[in-house]
Structures are given as structure tokens and as C-alpha cells.
């Protein structure tokens, strides 16, 4: 049995078992079971109010589950690891100072948090494909470009 568990988590990035999340008496998630494999792409779809955002917040550790367990790479959320401290999350519409360039937005953040050098910021922007646009104001970025800037921010904070 132990051998099976080890091999299961080698190929599993997220394992959700019997997860229920209640707000008061109302269950938003009820007995959710889900296994997400490494190297696969998944989407969460459903009607408004069906619990998609709540599920994502539980996986990230931003909301505790009422019952059940969520493991990310074998580590249980809320017990084995403090994921909000160690996880980079990119929201659907990242908020940046639109009058400044992508470089300037990341430099401001780096200065506030005493993080990385300006040269490293430029390397990260190149890695996410924003080097040709690094001097363009973020207000002129497409949504996809803003999301890539959000990815650059998450990389920078890692």
C-alpha cells in the first residue's frame, strides 16, 4: 500500500478527497473528489455560484475546507505546508499601475519588498515574452500581456 501511495503522488499534482466547504449551514462544495495529474491541463467550468472560485481558493490554501483533505504534490494544505506563503497565484485580471511600464511596475514591487535587481527583472520579462513591450505602459497591454506580467511577478517573488 505504501508503495502505491508513493507512485501515485509522483504523477499527481493535486489530490482532493471528500472535500466539503460550508459557509454557515450552506455547503458550497459537497464531497468533492478529484485527482489532477502532472503535465496535464485542466479547466474548472460551471454556472455562476457553483463553487469554482471557492474550490480554487481551497486548493491555494486561502480558505480552509470544512471536511476532507487537499494535497498538492503530496503535502496536505493547512497541515504539511503553508501554501499562501509559498504559492504564486495569478488572478484573471491582474492589477498594475497602468500609467507605468511593465518594468516600472515590477521595479516598484522589487524595491518595496527588497527583492531582485533591475537586470533580473528584465531577464524575467524576456522569459515570459514581454521584452519587446517592456517600455510600453501597462495600460496599452492586452489582457494576455497583463497576465504574462502577472506571471513575471510570481516568478520574481519565488
Task: Describe the residue ranges of each PLM region.
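Helix-to-loop junction immediately C-terminal to a conserved catalytic motif
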Residues: 60
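The feature captures the beta-strand-to-loop junction immediately N-terminal to the Walker
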Residues: 45-47
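Q-loop/switch helix immediately C-terminal to the Walker
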Residues: 93, 99-112
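Hydrophobic anchor residue at the start of the ABC signature
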Residues: 151
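Conserved ABC transporter NBD signature motif
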Residues: 68-83
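Conserved ABC ATPase "signature" region
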Residues: 107, 118-133
Amino acid at each position: 500500500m505504501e508503495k502505491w501511495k508513493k507512485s501515485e503522488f509522483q504523477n499527481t499534482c493535486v489530490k482532493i478527497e471528500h472535500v466539503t466547504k460550508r459557509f454557515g449551514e450552506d455547503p458550497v462544495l459537497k464531497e468533492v473528489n478529484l485527482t489532477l495529474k502532472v503535465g496535464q491541463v485542466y479547466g474548472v467550468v460551471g454556472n455562476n455560484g457553483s463553487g469554482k472560485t471557492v474550490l480554487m481558493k481551497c486548493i491555494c490554501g486561502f480558505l480552509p475546507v470544512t471536511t476532507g483533505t487537499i494535497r498538492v504534490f503530496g503535502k496536505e494544505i493547512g497541515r504539511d505546508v503553508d501554501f499562501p506563503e509559498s504559492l504564486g497565484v495569478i488572478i484573471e485580471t491582474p492589477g498594475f499601475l497602468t500609467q507605468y511600464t511593465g518594468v516600472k511596475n515590477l521595479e516598484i514591487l522589487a524595491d518595496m519588498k527588497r527583492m531582485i535587481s533591475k537586470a533580473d527583472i528584465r531577464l524575467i520579462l524576456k522569459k515570459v515574452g514581454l521584452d519587446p513591450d517592456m517600455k510600453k505602459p501597462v495600460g496599452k497591454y492586452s489582457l494576455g500581456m497583463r497576465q504574462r506580467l502577472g506571471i513575471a511577478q510570481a516568478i520574481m517573488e519565488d
